[in-house]
Amino acid sequence: MAREISSISRIGTSEPFELQVARGQISYHESVYKFGNNAQVADSVETIWQQGGLYSYLSAESVLKVSSSSANDTSAGTGARTVELFGLDGDYNEISETVTLNGQTAVNTTLSYLRINRMIVRSAGSGGANAGIIYAGTGTVTTGVPANIYATINGDGSNQTLMALWTVPAGYTGYLMQYDVSNGTTSNTPAVCKLLLVARPQGEVFQSKDVKSLTTGMHIENTLVVPLKFAEKTDIEARAVSSSNSVTFDISAAFEIIYIKNGDEL
């Protein structure tokens, strides 16, 4: 039988449990805040990430190619110079590495990834941000764009990926504490934007865990009294769809997860 990991908050300390987790004061507890944006959601279901469309996951551990649509994103350029990737290896263990960019020419990662959860610009030239769109992907790279795209950093000054998806690492259980969603549109045509919170346990298919319907300009903040529990290696993502083929929504979503080491992994 698996041992339960005890949280310090059970003895009534005055500092909030969530703050203690963020400060690294509770052993075997980690936190993650994932957020994304999709500015072109129409009447087909899309993942909330800047590339648009439904996200396609890597089916096997792979070396990724990191490149940019701009020649200025290079080691001595005015744009982004280095990026850090965060993901999971073929055994679903957390990994990360820093890559020095070479403009539109792809640079291979040293590590192999089964999941890419985040990518951040760590250093840049005088522009202070990436000049083009930075990609992490596989396949043939044409003018900086790989055939298969798994992460992007758009040239909007964010300096990191905006992708509302995450995978629970091996040996951990994830607890979704809260999620938020907001939207907007320039259309005057009445329409509803539907948010879908979905998850895929390993070896299964994506299943809806919550659904919210929003009209234009709405913001929903949903704090869960009882968190949603996700087993190791579960893919979690936020998706959206418009009720009208003539109304496109700009939608953002975020979720907070605390993930705890499984007792039998100690």
Predicted regions located by residue number:
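Beta-strand-centric surfaces of beta-sandwich/beta-rich domains
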Residues: 2-115, 122-266
